[in-house]
């Protein structure tokens, strides 16, 4: 992988990792368009740029994260379903990975967002701060996050949907989703890096480093912009976007 490809994929990862649109789907499509070889190193590269995106959330929310143990306890509770199911079903989840799965998950997730916004258009949300989230809500959101083990579902998408159903307002649902990414993705990416460490070499460290830094920068931009957007608008544009992207996926990859 050359530096140009590393920059492009870093931008795509950073912009999409925390939006409810499936970063996996975007990385697959862009890699196909650029003709990037889907080898073992490519998998390791994707894991490393995910790590860059995660660190952006740590940087942006550092004050809240270090304000007390309560938030960490809630994140730990929310992580339990994904941690347990991920450990038990790791091989089965990896076997689900296919472009067709991603495409259909994108479309279905888009429909869910549209239906949810229609049903909740006049709803008064009962939880208007991350601090007001209870442990039961945290655990329930954790089960929604487990759905993201299906490729294309989007981790942020599934947790935001869960938050909205449980009564979190849009911004709080997004913020808790971002915070929950920290334990979830640190552990998942750490394990995957360990499993794929044999693909690392001196020759490809520059691409890894560039992609990591680019993903970090663009993830910070995306998270800030997304929170501003969702404070004023709803998730309908993301639902429509997911459906369109899923259809493009199906046509481009000759799945229909």
Curated annotation (Swiss-Prot):
The chain crosses the membrane at residues 1-21, 41-61, 69-89, 96-116, 172-192, 207-227, 233-253. Its EC number is 3.6.1.27. Keywords: Antibiotic resistance, Cell inner membrane, Cell membrane, Cell shape, Cell wall biogenesis/degradation, Hydrolase, Membrane, Peptidoglycan synthesis, Transmembrane, Transmembrane helix. The keyword GTP-binding does not apply. It is found in: Cell inner membrane. The keyword Lipid biosynthesis does not apply. One of its GO terms (biological process) is peptidoglycan biosynthetic process. It comes from the Bacteria. Pfam families: BacA (PF02673). One of its GO terms (cellular component) is plasma membrane. Catalyzes the dephosphorylation of undecaprenyl diphosphate (UPP). Confers resistance to bacitracin. HAMAP family: Undec_diphosphatase. Bacitracin is thought to be involved in the inhibition of peptidoglycan synthesis by sequestering undecaprenyl diphosphate, thereby reducing the pool of lipid carrier available. Belongs to the UppP family. This is Undecaprenyl-diphosphatase. It comes from Wolinella succinogenes (strain ATCC 29543 / DSM 1740 / CCUG 13145 / JCM 31913 / LMG 7466 / NCTC 11488 / FDC 602W) (Vibrio succinogenes). The gene is uppP.
């Amino acid at each position: 992988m050359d530096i140009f490809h590393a920059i492009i994929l870093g931008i795509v990862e950073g912009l999409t990792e925390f939006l409810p649109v499936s970063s996996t789907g975007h990385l697959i499509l862009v890699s196909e368009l650029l003709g990037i070889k889907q080898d073992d190193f490519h998998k390791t590269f994707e894991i490393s740029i995910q790590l860059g995106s995660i660190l952006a959330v740590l940087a942006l929310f550092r004050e809240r994260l270090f304000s007390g143990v309560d938030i960490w306890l809630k994140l730990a509770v929310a992580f339990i379903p994904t941690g347990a199911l991920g450990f038990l079903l790791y091989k089965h989840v990896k076997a689900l990975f296919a472009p067709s799965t991603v495409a259909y998950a994108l479309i279905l997730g888009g429909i869910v967002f549209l239906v949810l916004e229609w049903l909740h258009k006049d709803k008064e949300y009962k939880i208007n701060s991350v601090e007001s989230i209870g442990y039961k809500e945290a655990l329930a959101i954790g089960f929604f996050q487990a759905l993201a083990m299906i490729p294309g579902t989007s981790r942020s998408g599934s947790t935001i949907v869960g938050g909205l159903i449980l009564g979190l307002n849009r911004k709080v649902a997004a913020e808790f989703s971002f915070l929950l990414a920290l334990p979830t993705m640190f552990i998942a990416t750490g394990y995957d890096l360990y499993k794929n460490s044999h693909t690392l070499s001196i020759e490809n460290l520059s691409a890894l480093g560039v992609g990591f830094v680019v993903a970090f920068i663009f993830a910070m931009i995306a998270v800030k912009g997304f929170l501003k957007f969702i404070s004023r608008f709803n998730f309908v544009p993301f639902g429509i976007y997911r459906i369109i992207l899923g259809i493009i996926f199906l046509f481009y990859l000759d799945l229909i």
